[in-house]
Amino acid sequence: MSLDINQIALHQLIKRDEQNLELVLRDSLLEPTETVVEMVAELHRVYSAKNKAYGLFSEESELAQTLRLQRQGEEDFLAFSRAATGRLRDELAKYPFADGGFVLFCHYRYLAVEYLLVAVLSNLSSMRVNENLDINPTHYLDINHADIVARIDLTEWETNPESTRYLTFLKGRVGRKVADFFMDFLGASEGLNTKAQNRGLLQAVDDFTAEAQLDKAERQNVRQQVYSYCNEQLQAGEEIELESLSKELAGVSEVSFTEFAAEKGYELEESFPADRSTLRQLTKFAGSGGGLTINFDAMLLGERIFWEPATDTLTIKGTPPNLRDQLQRRTSGGN
């Protein structure tokens, strides 16, 4: 992995009681040893693989102001990280669920892009076997389940300050929503809405095939084509490129997909991240509620599965063998 650490700082927040978080600050930066580089590379890998929300700094963001000064050489990285950790402690102290942890600030370069990654990591206990085959306790950083993480694309921020996507963050677990405190600490608000972009794409594709007067099978083939392209981009860690997608759909209509989307005003970005759950709707219908869960391929609608909107009734012709077997055993047993 072509990852180069520029500067990295680590501090700690310790929860002593319900009201107090103790601040433990390092007096020096971490040395980018092989172990440190491996840790950052793993954190980068794990973070990059997760679904993220996008944001941008507000004009009043204290973190953005001090980061800009640090980038201009008016403040060193250690001082910047120490002051920022203090502000994070003040934000966390407002919430009873605050657990503390290790606060990491890492300025690194990956594939010619500079990043600042900010994360709160937990220390977990486990067991290890030593050279004498004895079992001893050990501790490790829980990188795989880190959910208080944000990353600033410094290159994008400094070259395109009007961007709505230079800051990414994880939304966190239920009850520990990053928006409740981490976004306040960052002085940021949500920017590019990835789900909205993907929903807009799905609507544009449906309208595009309808205007082209395709039959049902042709429409589903186009949806499958779009899904295949988007899924390939997702698996490769790349964004959906409208121009590339439009080329994939050449021949569907006399008008290109990009021209159609622009003319109809779907407000799609030239490129945006793929959202797996939204894109799945191109090829499947799924829903749950009231003790019922249904999931089926879109091509079955109108063939083996029929929906009557007036009565909100779904009729299934030909049930799966394992389901049919369960139904037969239950009904024959009189239960």
UniProtKB/Swiss-Prot annotation:
Single GO MF annotation: double-stranded DNA binding
InterPro entries: Nucleoid_associated_NdpA
Pfam families: NA37
GO cellular component: bacterial nucleoid; cytoplasm
Location relative to the cell: Cytoplasm, Nucleoid
Keywords associated with the record: Cytoplasm
Coiled coil, from the record: none
Superkingdom, natural source: Bacteria
PANTHER family for the chain: NUCLEOID-ASSOCIATED PROTEIN YEJK, PTHR38772
Family membership: Belongs to the YejK family.
Name used for this protein in its record: Nucleoid-associated protein YejK
Organism: Shigella sonnei (strain Ss046)
